[in-house]
Design a protein with these regions (language model features):
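Short beta-alpha connecting loops at secondary-structure transitions
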Residues: 253, 287-288
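Short acidic alpha-helical/loop segments enriched in Asp/Glu that coordinate divalent cations
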Residues: 235-238, 277-286, 308-318
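Small/polar glycine-rich anion-binding or flexible loop at a beta-alpha turn
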Residues: 283-285, 320-328, 358-362
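Structured, contiguous alpha/beta core segments that scaffold functional sites
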Residues: 1-257, 262, 267, 271-274, ...
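A general alpha-helix detector
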Residues: 199-203, 337-340, 351
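Divalent metal-cofactor coordination and adjacent catalytic microenvironments
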Residues: 87-92, 96-106, 131-133, 257, ...
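Small-residue-rich helix-loop
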Residues: 289-295
């Protein structure tokens, strides 16, 4: 097997924000700061980050042939749900990880171990992370460097978007650079219109050649006119005889500005797999439920896989697993839930105490199952039929009745 980390084989991962690469390609770099200036991007990321950060993480023990049992006294649960051992609490930690997941090469957190026990999770800005990749495309391996200090992959919790090597993901600023740049340019265009006070752009037509002093005076006058600070008696331009102002019309662009912003908002909503109404705060119950199923839970699954890989001991893998408690996200509204419970109770595949448990209520200790006298019960193992209304039973295929 080839050596991956010999000094001559050590390569850095190419980044879409590499200034040399950008210069060679001749394209403008879309930064995370530009992306966050677009309200739909900032709102979409914040919406999903709040869902992830507000959903508790549980630890379960999987027992073959039985229901998985929840482990409540594990020390790692406190790090994931409350205090990380760093300056960030768990809520701030997961929000930062989700932002880096969408706008950087991934969310990274250093796993502080002492004697094999995880004592803290330290969030590290993704821009401080350098990926040192091997060159073998089959037996992939890599190291991570932070400010020149080198670490192994198992030293970090990694939450990566659309990764192909397990080391770095693909941010929205690379994958959807054109859409973000278009929306950002619209913001800049609108800002410039406001700064000009609504004054149109145009050009001057002169019947005779102007001297240098006249040109400078015109420049200063129009600078005051288009300046947001110009007001009162300074906010005008005096045109001498023979000079006309011709407006360069961009009315069609201005009229379509709001329409384009709505269109772009819809495109961004597709990137986050949510409805545009969710981001604008006008979501229906169905829209809210779709956020959990289509946007938050897939990201939670990515995080769960990372936790199971990097936080579990080797002897625990296959027996224990971390999972988000998504019950609250998927419960729906009260009317829908209670209608579903009624159907389950009428069909006898749920009991009263099971419904109360699902609603976080104290059980009543009722172990019986409600049956109707009109029912006929059949045991598929013994082929026995029992009729509660008459209190009789018989074997399938036999005509004689056995009275109980």
């Amino acid at each position: 097997m080839p050596l991956f980390f010999g000094r001559k084989r050590e390569n850095r991962a190419d980044s879409c924000e590499d200034p040399v690469l950008t210069a060679l390609l001749g394209s403008r770099t879309v930064t995370r700061e530009m992306a966050l200036q677009v309200p739909t991007v900032a709102g979409g990321i914040d919406l999903i980050a709040n869902l992830v950060a507000g959903t508790p993480i549980r630890l379960y023990k999987d027992t073959p042939g039985a229901k998985a049992t929840e482990v409540t006294n594990d020390y790692r649960l406190r790090l994931l749900n409350d205090e990380t051992g760093d300056t960030l609490n768990a809520n701030e930690f997961w929000k930062a990880m989700v932002r880096d997941y969408y706008l950087g090469k991934g969310g990274y957190a250093y796993i502080n171990r002492q004697g094999g026990k995880v004592v803290a999770l330290h969030y590290v800005e993704e821009r401080r992370i350098t990926v040192l990749k091997g060159t073998d495309p089959i037996f992939k391996d890599f190291d991570l460097a932070v400010d020149g200090y080198r670490y192994k992959p198992y030293d970090f919790l990694k939450v990566l978007r659309n990764t192909t090597d397990g080391a770095a993901g693909v941010p929205l600023t690379c994958e959807s650079a054109n859409l973000i740049e278009t929306a950002y340019a619209a913001q800049v265009f609108e800002k410039n219109m406001v700064r000009r006070g609504g004054n149109k752009k145009g050009f001057l037509k002169s019947e005779k050649r102007l001297d240098k002093d006249s040109l400078n005076e015109l420049r200063r006058g129009f600078a005051r006119l288009y300046s947001a600070d110009g007001e009162g008696s300074d906010n005008f331009v005096l045109l001498n005889n023979g000079i006309d102002f011709k407006e360069s019309s961009n009315t069609s662009v201005e009229l379509q500005l709001n329409e384009n912003k709505l269109t772009n908002a819809g495109e961004f909503a597709k990137l986050f797999h949510v409805s545009p109404d969710c981001i604008s705060g006008k979501a229906s119950e169905q829209d809210v439920a779709s956020i959990a199923r289509l946007a938050a839970i897939p990201l939670m699954t990515t995080i769960q896989c990372a936790l199971n890989k990097d936080l579990l001991l080797e002897r625990e893998k296959g027996q224990f697993y971390f999972a988000f408690d998504t019950k609250e996200l998927l419960r729906g509204d009260m009317k829908t839930r209670f209608a579903a419970y009624k159907t389950a109770l009428d069909a006898n595949f749920m009991q009263i105490d099971e419904v109360r448990y699902a609603e976080d209520m104290e059980p009543l200790g009722l172990d019986w199952i409600r049956l109707g006298l009109q029912d006929v019960l059949y045991n598929p193992k013994t082929h026995e039929l029992f009729t509660p209304n008459t209190g009789t039973s018989q074997q399938m295929g036999q005509l004689s009745l056995i009275h109980i």
